[in-house]
């Protein structure tokens, strides 16, 4: 690791906790060593076969009529109730072990004070530190349960991992870092290295306590501070707490009879065990979601037999991966603001599929539009716009289903791989090698629709009376969506946790960033949070800007705390509910986006669109009406001393 400009001089022993002689601040050296050099890989490959990089045209007369709508409903209803997941506790707790780092660095427990404590060390935390530092906030501390930075890119290091948003728009601070991604769609391994370089350059490692899981955070009304308890015995006090631990952080395991009896080796994709040699082995993978779509082609290249157990097929769209060209790097080097301009152009695209394809001509500014906008004789009502989107989505899905027929040779396998739900209802996937994998003689799709795998034995997986013998079993069963465990351990003014408040009265926030009764708490990228659309890091840009703005506002007013009025929260929650209900036909399937069909409207993601979210944010910042500022910063500072 290179030293950062902020690093204090340390002794030869480089203690885990030291004091900066210039400022008196505590600095840390708790970054864990990499567990093994075998943890390495790549993402999408560039494919030369043009037939694999284009979708067939939609069939003539394709229309989302009553017959097709009934087919979609039957596809959905046949799977209702099939999603059954369990907590990773007891004998299943091992699936959460950190397999990527050496054991935690030993350190003493901390019981001191800081101004800002942030939970997480992914892009949200890295961006926030960059901006806080620039704004003059330096008494900032981070807690991260993993052994290094990266967030989702730390935990997800499976073979084939890559980002589905183009790297030129996804990676933050590209110009500041002087970095050009090697591929249009960067691999997770490259993204992790980029996170590490960011952390080194801006002194993040000195501020972060790694292998430190926050277990409980309690508000002290008398002192206007949070007390943060961790699994390392810490009881740190902070004026402000920021949740920056992401939206897909808790892995899920499907509840399957007999899974504990499996005699072979098994692991979850978010804890990929690189000590397990897969070459020449019989391997099974349960799941065909976004992760499995990236994993399967890589497994197919090395294993002896591969069994892919699928309950619900994904949409397998064209990826068309390519390397960054020397000409692009030369052009961008001469073009100040190139990355920001590209990111903002991406944000103007309203179609998720178009945004995720990343049209280079449009994003580079060579053309004014990706394609001509369709014009209607009159302005459509919101309901008519939804119906128009459904019709467009249906034609795209027809093309995606036609692609399956064009690529997969076995008709039975092809039929099982065709999805029947609105495009984007489940997370879209992109790959040019996934479908061809099922033409290989040693790769077998086991169609477990509609209810999924129900039995595992010591020898392997059983379905329809057939036992599939396995040496290794991989669970690609995904993550809980916006269900971070942090919500269970944040205790606010009335003694309730955030989870208890939301369970009793429904999810209620203001902008997704505040919740009434939890002063000086900021929730980044949580339920009802908006502003980002399809590029997650653009949302983080907005959220981090907001947190810095609020801290500067509190400092300027000399206030100790900020909370939200109950009325502002109720109005925003109602807006989130209305936006969800209006657009719900676009998500008429069972997926983690809607809690497998069980989530209350407005309780998860924000569906009002980035423009509406920013409109509400700007109005709040201009008027300050939704906020309740109390106390004086001097009193809090005295209490901290």
Predicted regions and their residues:
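Class I S-adenosylmethionine-dependent transferase superfamily signal
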Residues: 299
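Glycine-rich NAD(P)-binding loop of Rossmann-like domains
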Residues: 276-283
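Flexible, glycine/small-residue-enriched loop-and-beta-strand segment within the central core
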Residues: 271
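Ligand/cofactor pocket segment of small-molecule handling proteins
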Residues: 296
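N-terminal FAD-binding dinucleotide-binding subdomain shared by FAD-dependent oxidases/monooxygenases
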Residues: 2-116, 121, 130-260, 275, ...
